[in-house]
Amino acid sequence: MESPAFFFSLFVWCLLLSITAYSLYVGFGPPSKQLRDPFEEHED
């Protein structure tokens, strides 16, 4: 368990998890009210 590959893979896994959590927060959390909807802006 002391190999550098284990710690590197753990770091990459935590990085991907945090990016995913932040994306979900921005997409569905309180900041989503500030996002624009291009389909709603373009009325035919």
UniProtKB/Swiss-Prot annotation:
GO terms for cellular component: chloroplast thylakoid membrane. This is Protein PsbN. It holds the Pfam family PsbN. The keyword Transmembrane applies. HAMAP family: PSII_PsbN. The keyword Thylakoid applies. GO terms for biological process: photosynthesis. The chain crosses the membrane at residues 6-26. It is found in: Plastid, Chloroplast thylakoid membrane. It is a single-pass membrane protein. Keywords: Chloroplast, Membrane, Plastid, Thylakoid, Transmembrane, Transmembrane helix. It comes from the Eukaryota. Disulfide bonds: none annotated. May play a role in photosystem I and II biogenesis. It comes from Tupiella akineta. Belongs to the PsbN family.
